[in-house]
């Protein structure tokens, strides 16, 4: 039998507070049961809300999972803006590396790479990566605008290179990610995407 008082409390949860409670509960369920074993009923119980309200807002479990994982990723791996492309990339890579080695980070990576038969899951995965890639690409675009990076640099390729390194460690190597990886990877990448700028400055000084 439903507790009237508890039902009243659930009914009062609305808007941003409702979303925050549900997403926190989703993350907790992922941590406890694994990303493949989370359903609306589990999250509703954990959040203390009506399961129907979850369906009305997110429609499917994959969309709820993506919302929760993307929100947590944005909080744990923000896009830095220090005024230096080298510093921004190194901070981004460092935070990404740390996050990838947490239970939620590992769950996120595995959720977005393991194949599934559900078209909805595939759409949600693509949506997640498009949002994250677009956000991270701003680091390179700002570097271009400041003249730190060659204007012909493929921003997405840079981000994919950094992210790909981290993902390989988590999904294939199964070993701790070296603490030196962010610095080494960023230095290697920047040696290529800043070479034209460096040469142009050298030519200007000689001229």
UniProtKB/Swiss-Prot annotation:
GO terms for molecular function: DNA-binding transcription factor activity; transcription cis-regulatory region binding. The keyword Transit peptide does not apply. Disulfide bonds: none annotated. PROSITE patterns: HTH_TETR_2. Residues 16-76 form the HTH tetR-type domain. Residues 39-58 bind DNA. Pfam families: TetR_C_11, TetR_N. Signal peptide: none annotated. Keywords: DNA-binding, Plasmid, Transcription, Transcription regulation. The keyword Transcription regulation applies. Induction: Up-regulated by PQS. May regulate the expression of genes involved in the degradation of the Pseudomonas aeruginosa quorum sensing signal molecules HHQ (2-heptyl-4-quinolone) and PQS (2-heptyl-3-hydroxy-4-quinolone). PANTHER family: HTH-TYPE TRANSCRIPTIONAL REGULATOR RUTR, TETR-FAMILY TRANSCRIPTIONAL REGULATOR. This is HTH-type transcriptional regulator AqdR.
